[in-house]
Amino acid sequence: MEGKLFLGQYLICVILLLGQLHGYKSCIEKERKALLELKAFLIPLNAGEWNDNVLSWTNDTKSDCCQWMGVECNRKSGRITNIAFGIGFIIENPLLNLSLLHPFEDVRSLDLSSSRSCEDCGFSGLFDDVEGYKSLSRLRNLEILDLSSHRFNNSIFPFLNAATSLTTLFLTYNNMHSPFLVKEFKDLTNLEHLDLRGNRFNGSIPTQDYNSLRRFRKLEILDLSDNLFNSRIFPFLNSATSLKSLSLWGNNMGGPFPAKELRDLTNVELLDLSRNRFNGSIPVRALFALRKLKALDLSDNEFSSSVELQGKFAKTKPLSGTCPWKNMEELKLSNNKLAGQFPLCLTSLTGLRVLDLSSNQLTGNVPSALANLESLEYLSLFGNNFEGFFSLGLLANLSKLKVLRLDSQSNSLEVEFETSWKPKFQLVVIALRSCNLEKVPHFLLHQKDLHHVDLSDNQIHGNFPSWLLENNTKLEVLLLQNNSFTSFQLPKSAHNLLFLNVSVNKFNHLFLQNFGWILPHLVCVNLAYNGFQGNLPSSLDNMKSIEFLDLSHNRFHGKLPRRFLKGCYNLTILKLSHNKLSGEVFPEAANFTRLWVMSMDNNLFTGNIGKGFRSLPSLNVLDISNNKLTGVIPSWIGERQGLFALQLSNNMLEGEIPTSLFNISYLQLLDLSSNRLSGDIPPHVSSIYHGAVLLLQNNNLSGVIPDTLLLNVIVLDLRNNRLSGNLPEFINTQNISILLLRGNNFTGQIPHQFCSLSNIQLLDLSNNKFNGSIPSCLSNTSFGLRKGDDSYRYDVPSRFGTAKDPVYFESLLMIDEFNMVNETNSQTKIEFATKHRYDAYMGGNLKLLFGMDLSENELSGEIPVELGGLVELEALNLSHNNLSGVILESFSGLKNVESLDLSFNRLQGPIPLQLTDMISLAVFNVSYNNLSGIVPQGRQFNTFETQSYFGNPLLCGKSIDISCASNNFHPTDNGVEADESTVDMESFYWSFVAAYVTILLGILASLSFDSPWSRAWFYIVDAFVLKVRNMLWQNTAGTKCSYVLVSLSSPSVVVLLKPPALFHKTRT
């Protein structure tokens, strides 16, 4: 009986199959030829990036076009119904000939979108020389038209308006602009789905068009996202009462939430207003009018209050912990400024599937009432300031939960879990960052479907959890950085893991040699800041998909494996810095044809710069500084026109700087400092990148500065070389931001062009031979007046990012994709002297430092009073010059100065009391001048040591423990010139020299006689010398280098002694 039944079923199936085959027809010849004509039209316009669709269309009469890729036909009529062209990179912005589409009379769906979205590619318009604007009316059954990612503008609307049968129209990411006029497609009344996202529509809609959307009674989905609309568009949208989905993310909307303007959209189920600038409170009650609302996205705005979410209302009764959104399924409020505790009313939304409150300022405890949300699939609370204890056991009954993301920015949240706990859910994503975990949660042993695990920034210790890989064959992302793991182990069999980050742990053992065999599919690996030892494993060459590899800050040693250099051809970023790797660097060609960034600094590499670097055509950043490289810099490096940053500092490179380096078009950072380079700076450097950083300090460079060198650089460091001559008179003052010339042999006066340094931040001209006066116009320089201007960056960033769309469950809203972004900064490091010491500044600290150092030169004259106007200056050093006059009262305006050094000059008069207003002053030095009067007291002056005033015998006061009551001190009022009784030291020196020579000759003449009168003569000379010495101690402040005549007890010995080392001018 069963056999007969089976036979009957089999016969029925055969009959049905034969019936279908009998009814099937192949494509119509006219349409086959039309497809080939379309192909012939499109191919010449393409830059070679087609998918397989059009390429599969062959001119073979035996080939059924209904079987071609991208083509679908009606099985009965044989007519084409759907065409997806798969257009690639269209060049020169041609027009699309619509007449080529006319043969497809029964087509229902046309996909003419481009697979490439760029600013200058794709079709720019439509045309039909015969039918004109009515061309698309020939396609009477056309329902779906996709013209996305081209350069179409508003001129195509008259053509589109003729396609009255359209129900779905995609015009995303084109070049359409304001105004947005509905009358342009007023006849498309059958539209159900209109997508205009990614254009340039802006402004508001004319008042007369406010009700124009009413004619589109079938319109259910409208997407105007990623345009430039403002909030005045809402009265216009309020008339589209048939809408079920409205997306306006990424526009220019601001102000309070437009609840009143949206009150008539009672059919809306999805509302996306994310990535705008709405502020104020989220109007829970006002949104109650949208009774059918299922998905609401208000993320990435500026909402700052969750008062209504807390169930607290003015003039109304409280919600008593109940939200009025009974149909809500998905709610995204992330990346706002919501403060206060977790909104408890949300825990009453039992139908909620997605809840995202991440990246706000919520505090307090994570509520246990989350257990009420039994439909929850996605819960994201990371990026807040939750505190206290939270037990994961409270979520045990959420059987549908797939994504759990939780952390605490304040690191005050402690997540607890029971050892024996076995939840009902099977997670796909778990992220528990900064949750004070000390071990991997035990319940993960029961999770078998994990794709993404993030337990970073905790205190987990012990072995690397290789069992996570063994239990979860679909695991793609494993992030365990910044923990305390001590033993790195891997499973025995290969795994499909894509992203691994175990940086900043406490691994301190030999690295696994089978790493590349067990994890062959890795795309991104970060093992930095550990203690891994041994040679780099040759198995790394098995990771054919690897793009980002960071092994820096470990203890790897030995040479680079040859198999590694030949095998990982997809590498984009390679970081091997701060290890003990040795041998030559790239002596032969490597297979890193896609490599952008290579960091090999702080190792033990030796020998010449290898020719293998010539095989890296895509290289943007090369850092092999702080090694032991020798030889010359090869000129062929200049062939790498894609270089952004080249860092070769702190090696033993010799010879001259190749001129070719300055011909690299986009070179932003060139660091050749601390080598043994010699010769002149290449004279023709005008082609260097605009805004470049050039670091050549600590070499043996000689000659003069080329006139063209300063045209484009923003940072120039030439300190401690052998450069000489005058500074170039022409300087592009709009660019230079940091100019450091210390420790050379420059002469002449400070050029007046320096007064126009509109972006200067650090200026160091110290330890040279500049003379003349300090230009008073230096007060016109910026020195921090543009500190809010972020137009200059001293670092060269290189970003590596990989995004992965979450396919863990279906969502009405855009769920945040997984981004693994690694940024490598080629940092500019600058040393600058402040507070009597050299400190290194880089990154954000460098951008906040403003200083001027003119010390150790031969500058003379008075200090310009205008320097007191440099109000943002933080360090000023004028020491070891021949400056005269008084200390400026205007210095009191330097409120930000932390270090002021005026020592070893010839300044006189009092220290102005107004200087006590310099509230930031930490280091003050006026030693070895000719100052007089009372040392000010109060504020910062109470903290300065007596050494700050040495060599000024006429100063007195409590700060230096010298009483001002003695008759020897006659304080001078501020603003009064120096005491007329002060010895004219210059005249005194000349008279002293003449007297000294006369006496010396007399002494030498009498040395041959030994008589009572000669001994009496020596006693008289002793007394005279003692008197002269006392006078010198009181009046020689400000002299740089003096000699004191001292007579010893022996009448026949007279010596010259230098003053103590404290008196001496030092040159560093």
Swiss-Prot record:
Q: Which residues form the signal peptide?
A: 1-23
Q: Where are the transmembrane segments?
A: 987-1007
> Where in the cell does this protein reside?
Cell membrane
Q: Which residues are glycosylated?
A: 59, 97, 153, 202, 279, 397, 471, 482, 501, 570, 591, 663, 700, 735, 745, 771, 780, 822, 877, 882, 925, 930
* NAD among keywords: no
Q: How does it sit in the membrane?
A: Single-pass type I membrane protein
Keyword terms of this UniProt record: Cell membrane, Glycoprotein, Leucine-rich repeat, Membrane, Receptor, Repeat, Signal, Transmembrane, Transmembrane helix
- Principal localization reads membrane
Q: Which ranges does the UniProt record give for the LRR repeats?
A: 104-129, 139-162, 164-187, 188-212, 216-239, 241-264, 265-290, 292-315, 325-349, 350-373, 375-397, 398-423, 424-447, 448-471, 472-497, 499-517, 519-543, 544-567, 569-594, 596-615, 616-639, 641-664, 665-688, 690-710, 711-734, 736-757, 758-781, 846-870, 871-893, 895-918, 920-943
Give the matching Pfam families. LRR_1, LRR_8, LRRNT_2
Q: Which domain of life is it from?
A: Eukaryota
Q: Which Gene3D superfamilies match?
A: Ribonuclease Inhibitor (3.80.10.10)
Which GO CC annotations does the UniProt entry carry? plasma membrane
Topological domain, Cytoplasmic: which ranges? 1008-1068
Kindly give the InterPro entries that the UniProt entry links to this protein.
Leu-rich_rpt, Leu-rich_rpt_typical-subtyp, LRR_dom_sf, LRR_N_plant-typ, RLP_Defense_Trigger
Q: Please list the residue ranges that the record places on the Extracellular side of the membrane.
A: 24-986
Protein family per UniProt: Belongs to the RLP family.
Q: Would you tell me the protein name for this molecule? A: Receptor-like protein 13
Q: Which organism is it from?
A: Arabidopsis thaliana
Taxonomic lineage per UniProt?
Eukaryota, Viridiplantae, Streptophyta, Embryophyta, Tracheophyta
